Amino acid sequence: MCTNYAQSFAQLTTLDYNILTTNNLINMSEKKIMVIGSSNTDMTVVADRLPVPGETVLGGKFAMGPGGKGANQAVAAQRLGGNVSFICKVGKDIFGENAIRHYNNEGMDTTGIMLSEQPSGVALISVDTHAENCIVVASGANGDITEADIESHRKEIEAASILLLQLEIPVEAVVRAAKIGHEAGVYVVLNPAPACDLPEEIYQYLSLIIPNQTEIALMTGIEARDEEGAAKAVEALRGKRVQDVIVTMGSKGSMVYHQGQATFVPSKKVNAVDTTAAGDTYCGGLCVALSEGKDIIEAARFATAASALTVQKRGAQDSIPYRKDIIL
């Protein structure tokens, strides 16, 4: 419950909420990108190395800011030129209040944000000096998103051109959103993170799925350490009726599988300091490029350029670049 947090937001009125969620859209694309997913407050500490189980290590710098895979991807798409609507659920606490104000300031449509009696989601992130990270998430309000909540936004989903989903909210809600989008002819994109067992039903609703190497191995049972392994794993996924697949492969780049053809898009060589939001920036950037009419290979190159900038800065949303920063 929200009693452990700031009381001012716990007494939020309808008028206050409407003011908070009044959108201020500034974008380059008229096609709507609908993002449905998580909203967290990230608490990040930097250490020389990540602890092993049972070990305590001393950290260095600490930072707190907005995060969550859904929110990160929505912010990335907005900053990179997209026309974004974001549907999420936050608690009636100071974290929720700050999140709504932040998303509104980013310029996205925030009228789909819902309030929960659960506390807002929180992510505890540890990052080492080699830019590797580990994350533990307390879902809070994110876990309170129901199929009924998704149904209440059916018209908005059906009006979108692209629907971008992740797995930090209940999978039943994700499946319902994907089905609504698919049946309305919306281009449905799933980033299956964090990795989990997916119901077979969802695959038929997807236009594109974007797993990393760990996620595709969990979904198919096939390791994707290199291009050959990725190709075998993708074939297994395509057998589930997914149209297109992009496997992100960290600093190596990504493999794009489209209409039976595989294309490798290499990453730019940069000095990475924090990979926390790299995948989210990639997904958001890819959807922006697709909404602007670029083909999937061009879109992957744009997404790669955006994520290359992200890993050069610390933090989640603090590291996400703007359109003017992208150099192809």
Where do the language-model regions lie?
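A short, aliphatic-rich alpha-helical micro-motif
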Residues: E156-E158, Y203-Q204, G239
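Conserved beta-alpha-beta core of the PfkB/ribokinase-like small-molecule kinase fold
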Residues: I162-K232, K252-S254
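Gly/Ala-rich phosphate-binding loop of Rossmann-like dinucleotide-binding domains
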Residues: Q78, H182, S291
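Conserved N-terminal subdomain of the carbohydrate kinase-like
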Residues: P53-V57, M64, R79-S161, I327-L328
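Conserved phosphate-binding/catalytic region of the ribokinase-like
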Residues: Y17, N23-I33, C196-E201, E227-L328
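Glycine-rich phosphate/adenosyl-contacting loop at the front of the ribokinase-like
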Residues: M1-T3, T14-K89, I94-I100, N105, ...
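Short beta-strand scaffold segments in enzyme catalytic cores
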Residues: V75, V122-S126, G253-V256
